[in-house]
C-alpha cells in the first residue's frame, strides 16, 4: 500500500505524472480570465481633497470601500514630518462606480470640512501616481535628523566641503556639455578674510603721522604744558554744597549790640 503523504493539493491531475503540465495549463487559464475581466471593467480614479489631518489610510480606505471594490489607494504624506497633506487618490475597479462616488461625495460635509471629490480622466492620471501604494508608511527616522544636524569636527567639515565641491564641478561640466550657459553661486561659501591687514594699516598710519624724534624746544615745552593743563581741567570735578536757609537768615538779621549805659543806670538805682 502507498504511504499517506498529507492532504490532496487543490490543483491535482487525475494522472500523477501530468501534475506539472496540468498546473501550467491552469495558470494560463487564470491569467486569461483576469485579462478578460480587466478588459470588461475599466478602472476609474477619484481625487479626494480637503481631508482632515487626523484620518489615516485605513479610515479612508474603509469608508471608500462601501461604494465598490478598490484596486489601489494612496494618501499623500509629507516626507519630512510624515503628516497627511490633506488629499488622496482612490482607484476603483469600475469607472462607473468612480463617477458615482465623485458626484455624491463632492461638497460633502465631513469632519467640519467640505470634501472636494473629482473624477480624473485617464489622460490626467500619471503613470507613477500609485507607485509604492501598497508599501506601509514609515515615519521619518529622527536619529537620522539628529545625525545630520550634529556638530562636526574640523576633519568632517573638510570632507563635506570636498564632497560639495566635487558635486559642483560635475554639475557645471554637465551644463557645459549640454550647452547651457547658467551661472549659480558655489555650494561652499567662501571663508571671511581676517581683519589683520586693516589693523596693521591703521597702526602704520598712526606711526607715520607722528614725528620721528620731537625736539625739546621752548615752544614744544609750552605746547605740552598747555595740553596737560587742558587734560587736568577736564578731569577736575567741583562739588558745591547747598547753603542752608537758616544760616542765611542769621546772617541777614544780626543780633543787636548791648549798650553799656543801661547797665550803669541799673547799678546806680540799686544803690
UniProtKB/Swiss-Prot annotation:
UniProt main location, coarse: nucleus
PROSITE patterns: RRM
Record field: compositional bias (Basic residues): 261-271
InterPro entries: NIFK_FHA_Ki67-binding, Nucleotide-bd_a/b_plait_sf, RBD_domain_sf, RRM_dom
Coiled coil: none
Subcellular compartments: Nucleus, Nucleolus; Chromosome
Modified residues (N-acetylalanine): 2
Modified-residue entries (Omega-N-methylated arginine), positions: 223-224
Modified residues (Phosphothreonine): 213, 217
Modified residues (Omega-N-methylarginine): 113
UniProt keywords, alphabetically: Acetylation, Chromosome, Isopeptide bond, Methylation, Nucleus, Phosphoprotein, RNA-binding, Ubl conjugation
Residue numbers of Phosphoserine PTMs: 226
GO cellular component terms, semicolon-separated: condensed nuclear chromosome; cytoplasm; nucleolus
PTM annotation: Phosphorylated.
Chain positions of cross-link Glycyl lysine isopeptide (Lys-Gly) (interchain with G-Cter in SUMO2): 37, 178, 191, 247
Taxonomic superkingdom: Eukaryota
Gene3D superfamilies on file: 3.30.70.330
Sequence position, cross-link Glycyl lysine isopeptide (Lys-Gly) (interchain with G-Cter in SUMO1): 247
CDD domains hit by this protein: RRM_NIFK_like
Molecular function in Gene Ontology: RNA binding
Quaternary structure (record): Binds to the FHA domain of MKI67; this interaction is enhanced in mitosis.
This protein's name: MKI67 FHA domain-interacting nucleolar phosphoprotein
Organism: Rattus norvegicus
Gene responsible for this protein: Nifk
